[in-house]
């Protein structure tokens, strides 16, 4: 089932096809539908949320139960096993420890004539986190979005997540939110939740930044509201690219490919190796492990359409292909991964060595698992504390420093036809010359 390609031109064409897998005519149609939803929420607020939640989630939402109650939050702790609570707490600790090390510090520097230049970082006032529902519950998504926002110092962080047909929310999601210090949670999902966060309703506050993954409707809604609010990214389906040599364990490689494919029918799982025998063995292992897979239909579809093994002449060629694809997750299951990593230019996250499956990064390693997809790793990075911060330049000039640059400002402003710019400096210089 895992197709093997050994011609370079064909491999490049396949990687391009996989990278563009969400760019189809259906997206254009969906964008029109999403625009209608967003505009309805902007106009009608809570009433539109109630209507769309009934239509899409099958739950008769009321304005008074949009927000999750304190009783529900308390009860969630009784609804999950202790082992899961312990795992959530371990993940929270690891993620927080990593992100605290990544907080940029404000700074100033002093020039020769006493001028002061610097940069000051401040958090946004409000952040809205989207946590998907649907096929699975994602407490890890809560932590990966909530922890950077809290570490950044955002004063008000709220969560939206879609309810089940009975209005319930997954207790693990509610527990993860509370462990991260968030108790303001709203039971609404989809494009309508993004619109509510962007424009505000009588119940849900307007925020400054929206983060969190979702389906195509959520992604399109984030695209539409960008500019009204900041967003983390426009995430596409998940993907892993594994570079492996003959030292790799084919069972482990197959398991890592399937771990990505089980996310979504559009997920991509790619192996690049200079070893044809390894590629063949991995293909056999993929089929064997699929037989009893609990998410076989989803996983099988992803492997059939976006699973691929590419056989190349060298590891150097493998890295070149990877850089062209710019994967969300890159695993280096090779004998000396640190020797190879220096050649990697574009990847959302890099997992070095056979004992570092991508799942470690999904849950407990600490670095963020919200990563650029669909080739965006060429220019974008993981969600971080900086997603919830903005910087302001600090500039203070003295008499001496103003005198030193005044003529240059005058000349440049005059050349651009901005006379008042030039005059604003001339007046000060004249005052200093008296």
Curated annotation (Swiss-Prot):
It catalyses: L-histidinol + 2 NAD(+) + H2O = L-histidine + 2 NADH + 3 H(+). NAD(+) binds at residues 130, 192, 215. Its cofactor is Zn(2+). One of its GO terms (molecular function) is zinc ion binding. One of its GO terms (cellular component) is cytosol. PROSITE patterns: HISOL_DEHYDROGENASE. The keyword Ribonucleoprotein does not apply. Keywords: Amino-acid biosynthesis, Histidine biosynthesis, Metal-binding, NAD, Oxidoreductase, Zinc. Zn(2+) binds at residues 260, 263, 362, 421. It comes from the Bacteria. Pathway: Amino-acid biosynthesis; L-histidine biosynthesis; L-histidine from 5-phospho-alpha-D-ribose 1-diphosphate: step 9/9. Catalyzes the sequential NAD-dependent oxidations of L-histidinol to L-histidinaldehyde and then to L-histidine. This is Histidinol dehydrogenase. It comes from Synechococcus sp. (strain ATCC 27144 / PCC 6301 / SAUG 1402/1). The gene is hisD.
